[in-house]
Amino acid sequence: MGVFKIEGGHTLKGSITPQGAKNEALQVLCAVLLTDQKVTIHNIPDIQDVNKLISLLENLGVKIQKLGKGTYSFQADDINIDYLKSEAFHTEGQALRGSIMIVGPLLTRFGVGYIPKPGGDKIGRRRLDTHFDGFIKLGAHFEYDENNFTYSVVAKKLKGSYMLLEEASVTGTSNIIMAAVLAEGTTTIYNAACEPYVQQLCRMLNAMGADIQGIGSNLITINGVERLEGCTHTILPDMIEIGSWIGLAAMTRSEITIKNVGWEHLGIIPTIFQKLGITFEKKNDDIHIPAHTNGYEIQNYIDGSILTVADAPWPGFTPDLLSIVLVVATQARGEVLIHQKMFESRLFFIDKLIDMGAKIILCDPHRATVIGNGFRSPLRATLMTSPDIRAGIALLIAALSAKGTSTIYNIEQIDRGYENIDGRLKALGAQIVRVS
């Protein structure tokens, strides 16, 4: 188990370029299974979750070539479906929640999809019902093996259908779209997720020959086609990383420029950080954050009540950045209510921040009130463990702003979502050491 030793309290300076979007990568990589032609993907992040998925695809029989940093070609012209029943696949699939995304492509192209109950972050219940309800509506037969915790779907030929999703699940929407592109007839998905990740997947599929309409809306129409061709696709910058670096700059009162952010795909993210009092300047496609030497002040609502930041389906605020907002608010002037609607365990890392001196009231598993300190006294260094990707990066930011040397255990959780995090922070002047 790896460990980070962080000497906090240092001002950082410089520029940083966000990695490719993790959540998009996990989807578009699975889409290569939909064709026997070569697919080339650029800007793939070098992180644990993505590398595990690439390994899984290779074990399934996908021919993979690394063409350069972040660029790979994939050709799924000799898939070994029997691998799905192997103990090795069971182990691989359990270790990666993103493995659920292979089911739609395999089901529509080969007539079978099989997956063990996936792993991932321990952040509460994360149901897979949306995925399998969609496959069933397309004509698949579903079975769940309670003894081995495995899901399977089979179908001779999927048929298009109308469906109203119970929840606007990002991965559920994408999985159903991938299953529907080769189905017979027309599929209509209402209450579809419309995050940039889903939009990018749809654009990639259309480039491969799919017929998807309504991209960017919550009403998606897919006219099935007989086959898909190859394509070249570039993954967007990771908006979660961009939000993390904005929070890092504010908490450490550092001057940082975030390069090539893909501003048009950031949605409400910049606005939320501005409501926390953080100022920045858009320069072409870069974000320049000045050193907040005088701190930052949370904006109340116009009636004087305290600000609430809550997650919501796109174009609402992504739940993956609530932990960053929470930690940034600990050193702001003012108060904010954080409302995590989607997951009931994502706020359970705040005890570590309280140990560091933060003033936070956990109202219930979904809500916490943060009373900002306004940099009147720095957070205190401490020992802590990273429970998941997003809490891990929030604790790392807290440690970089704290006085003294902090230790973070279980940093593999951070590595799952952030590429070369310690090396990139060192380039900004951070005092961080990785210990094996």
Label every model-predicted segment.
Residues M1-S436:
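Short, structured segments at the rim of ligand-binding sites
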